[in-house]
Amino acid sequence: MCKVCKRRGNILLHPHEEESKKKGAEKVPAESSRVLPKDLRGRSGILLRMKERWYENIVLNIPHAGVRGLESIKCDNKVNLLTEVRRWTDWFTDLIFIPEKNDRIKHIIADFSRFAVDVERLLDDPLEKNGQGIIYMKYNGQQRYVDEKERTKLMAYYYDYNDRLKSMLSEHSLLIDCHSFPSDLSDMDICIGFNEDWSKPTDFVIDLVVELFKQHGYKVGINMPFSNAIAPETGYTYNSIMIELNKRVYLNEETFEFNDNAPKLREQLASLYSLLLRYSEEV
C-alpha cells in the first residue's frame, strides 16, 4: 500500500492523485499588509494576513455522490454490494457543496457510482493489484464480473470525466475536492487535505479554511483522517484542497435525511467560497 492509500473498511482508497506529487512546492508569496475582516488566527497563533495569490474561480469536484450503473454490476452477492454502497457513497455532497448560481464557481459531478467506475483512480493505480483500481473488481470479499463491452463503456466515462474536469481549470483556479466519510471512522467533523507539491495552497489559505470551520464550532483535522487532494496534470499550476465532511454534520446516516445542521453547513461553505473569491478582486 502506498503512503497515501487509506483503508476505509473493506475499500482501499487513495482518491487523491499520489502520482501528481513532485519535488519543489511553490514558494509562499509574501504577506500583504491588509488584514481579514475577522480576527482569524492560524496554526501558529498569529493574525492571518492577506497573501498575494487568490483565485479567479473555484471548481468543485464531486466524484463519489452518484449511484448510476449499480443495476448493471454483476457480482457474487448483490446484498453485500448494496451494503458497501450505502456506507461509502458520499451521499448528497452535491446538494451540500454546490451553492446558488455563481459564474465563478463551476462544478462537476460523477453520476456513476464509484462501485461502477471510480473517476479519481489513476490509470496505473497501485490499488489495481488489490482489485480496486478504476473499475473495482473486489470488495468485502466479493468478486465482480465485467465483460469487455462494459469495461470499454466505463473507461470511456472515466476519460470523459477527467477531460471535462481539466477543461474547467485555469492557472488561477482553486480546485476543491468534495467528499464525506462515515461518522464511525473519526471524531473529526471536517477533514482538510492537500498535497505537498505544486498544487498545495499557501499556508494562509489552508489556515483560513481551517479557522473558518473552527469558528463555526467544528472539530477540524488537517490531512487526517484522510490526506491529499486530486490534482490532475494540466500543463500549468493551480491550487487544490480537499474538504471531507463527517456525514454526521449534515446527515442522519440511518434515514438518509438531512439533519438540522445541513442548511447551515451549506451556507457556511457558500460563505467560504465568497471569501476566497472576493479577495482576488482586491489584490
For each predicted feature, which ranges?
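Cysteine-centered motifs
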Residues: C2-C5
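Short hydrophobic alpha-helical segments enriched in small aliphatic residues
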Residues: P15-E17
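Serine residues within intrinsically disordered or low-complexity segments
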Residues: S20, S32-S33, S44
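Polybasic, lysine-rich low-complexity intrinsically disordered segments
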Residues: K22-K23, K27
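N-terminal catalytic or cofactor-binding beta/alpha core of small enzyme domains
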Residues: R43-L175, S180-V283
